A protein has these predicted regions:
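Accessory cap/linker subdomain of secreted extracellular hydrolases
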Residues: 140-179
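Alpha/beta-hydrolase fold nucleophile elbow
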Residues: 107-119
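Conserved alpha/beta-hydrolase
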Residues: 52-78
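Short, surface-exposed "cap/lid" segments of acyl-processing enzymes
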Residues: 24-60
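Alpha/beta-hydrolase active-site loop
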Residues: 85-105
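Alpha/beta-hydrolase
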Residues: 34, 71-73, 140
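N-terminal cap/lid segment of alpha/beta-hydrolase-fold proteins
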Residues: 1-26
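Short glycine-enriched nucleophile-adjacent loop
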Residues: 122-132
Length: 179
């Protein structure tokens, strides 16, 4: 059976989170889930789409014997702060604060902390290795290129798709990336 508790982790802002576990009888390793870009909630739902992506990942990790924390990014859902003005550095700090909070719990093995980041969360997980002692990181759907290159490539793909539309013709793309 999976137990879940809603918690608030406070520092300069309050982060609404859910901690999931089988029991608190012994120290267990921790997985911190960090979601991708946007205002998706801690369960993985956004804009009317209920996917429960992060809830399902959490359940999987708990079944494997981990304690799992997933949280709402700053300025979204049950977290305070300003989503629009929060920087990447702020997001890394928020994740680090959650790790520090979790390491103080008597049922967390502070030597066995793993971060699982999806999309933008993969970037945050990677940056966390600079300041946090982690047992490992799991990167899901992380970028394989810089943000500028990714945006240029997305523009290129949109241009290609529009070119294939019947009855429409664009003379040239807004930006043609070097490939």
């Amino acid at each position: 059976m999976i137990n879940e508790e809603k918690i608030i982790i406070s520092n300069d802002i309050n982060l609404g989170a859910t901690i999931a576990y089988k029991d608190k009888k012994e120290k267990r390793p921790l997985v911190l889930l960090i979601m991708g870009t946007g205002t998706t909630d801690r369960d993985g739902n956004s804009f009317g789409f209920k996917t429960n992506l992060y809830k399902n990942l959490s359940d999987m990790f708990v079944e494997m014997g981990y304690v799992c924390i997933r949280y709402d990014k700053r300025g979204t859902h049950e977290s305070t702060g300003d989503y629009k003005t929060g920087s990447l550095s702020d997001l890394v700090t928020d994740a680090a604060n959650i790790i520090q909070y979790a390491k103080k719990l008597d049922y967390i093995d502070e030597e066995k902390v793993v971060v699982c980041g999806h999309s933008e969360g993969a970037m945050i997980a990677t940056l966390l290795t600079r300041t946090e002692k982690l047992r490992g990181i799991i990167l899901l759907g992380g970028a394989c290129m810089g943000l500028k290159e990714a945006l240029q490539y997305q523009n290129y793909l949109v241009f290609e798709q529009v070119q294939d539309m019947k009855g429409k013709r664009i003379v040239s793309p807004l930006y043609w990336p070097s490939m």
